[in-house]
């Protein structure tokens, strides 16, 4: 649903409508000056863009996101995200994303991604 260049991090593997894997190295400019902890929006963006990339659609939107920041991340950490489509219902894809650093889960998210292509198709079918 999104272009490879729009993914936050480096895409390592992608199986449309199934799973995706990406990696991101946390640099000094990604952390808060006072605490040295990575800004949360980098992990959210990494997870969300990977979830969008997994969906095989021209256009898709994030309808719902449930996120949990589990462990603080510092500069120098290498994050690995894995997105898995857990199920699909009509135009909605339910995707679980886990981000790990050194095999420890630091972030997790559950997203509902809506395929706008399929939504439009369903609406046309209902009108007919």
Task: Write out the residue ranges for each language-model feature.
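Hydrophobic beta-strand-centered segment that forms part of the acyl-chain substrate-binding groove
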Residues: 48-80, 85
């Amino acid at each position: 649903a999104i272009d490879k260049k729009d993914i936050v991090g480096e895409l390592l593997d992608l199986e449309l409508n199934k799973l995706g894997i990406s990696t991101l190295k946390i640099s000094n400019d990604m952390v808060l000056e006072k605490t040295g902890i990575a800004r949360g929006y980098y992990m959210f963006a990494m997870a969300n863009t990977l979830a969008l990339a997994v969906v095989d659609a021209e256009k898709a939107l994030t309808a719902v996101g449930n996120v949990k920041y589990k462990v603080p991340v510092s500069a120098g950490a290498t994050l690995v995200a894995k997105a898995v489509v857990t199920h699909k219902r009509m135009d909605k894809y339910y995707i679980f994303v886990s981000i790990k650093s050194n095999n420890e889960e630091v972030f997790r998210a559950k997203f509902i991604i809506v395929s706008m292509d399929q939504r439009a198709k369903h609406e046309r079918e209902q009108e007919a």
